[in-house]
């Protein structure tokens, strides 16, 4: 084998090892992102909701700072109920569609998928209704979320 071929093979192996260390994106969270965009008709990027208030994003504690943060708290609680039913809400895929007046779950027969889809659709619609206060994005949760 030629030295150049060995270098190419080594580069491919190193690339594959690097790719293997990237954690997979939970499918449901990708779907939830699409539901949010459907509900708010693309008026606000999904990432605006990932670090908002005390409950939007990973985890949550304390008193919600406003209506939008209460939507996130309700969504967190809904996922908690799904987990009590033995469901894996961040990993479940489900069938939905985006209509003119927002997202809907589509003919879901399996209990876990239906429950999680309902959690996500209700949260997305709640996000669309609630005012967004820029001052509540990226707050110091250690101070404000006791």
Swiss-Prot record:
Ca(2+) binds at residues 55, 57, 59, 76. GO terms for biological process: arachidonate secretion; lipid catabolic process; phospholipid metabolic process. Binds 1 Ca(2+) ion. It is found in: Secreted. The active site is at 75, 120. It comes from the Eukaryota. Residues 20-27 form a propeptide. It holds the Pfam family Phospholip_A2_1. GO terms for molecular function: calcium ion binding; calcium-dependent phospholipase A2 activity; phospholipid binding; toxin activity. Expressed by the venom gland. Its cofactor is Ca(2+). Disulfide bonds join 38-98, 54-145, 56-72, 71-126, 78-119, 87-112, 105-117. Its main location: secreted. Residues 1-19 form the signal peptide. PANTHER family: PHOSPHOLIPASE A2, PHOSPHOLIPASE A2 FAMILY MEMBER. Belongs to the phospholipase A2 family. Group I subfamily. D49 sub-subfamily. This is Acidic phospholipase A2 S14-72F.
């Amino acid at each position: 084998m030629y030295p150049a071929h060995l270098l190419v093979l080594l580069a491919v192996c190193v690339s594959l090892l690097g790719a293997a260390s990237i954690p997979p994106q939970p499918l449901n969270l990708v779907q939830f992102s699409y539901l949010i965009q459907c509900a708010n008709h693309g008026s606000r990027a999904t990432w605006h909701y990932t670090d908002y208030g005390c409950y939007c994003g990973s985890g949550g504690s304390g008193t919600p700072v406003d209506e939008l943060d209460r939507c996130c708290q309700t969504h967190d609680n809904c996922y908690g109920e799904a987990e009590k039913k033995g469901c894996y809400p961040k990993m479940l895929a489900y069938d939905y569609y985006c209509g003119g007046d927002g997202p809907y779950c589509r003919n879901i027969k399996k209990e876990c998928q239906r429950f999680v889809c309902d959690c996500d659709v209700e949260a997305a619609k709640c996000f669309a209704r609630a005012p967004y206060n820029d001052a509540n994005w990226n707050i110091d949760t250690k101070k404000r979320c006791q």
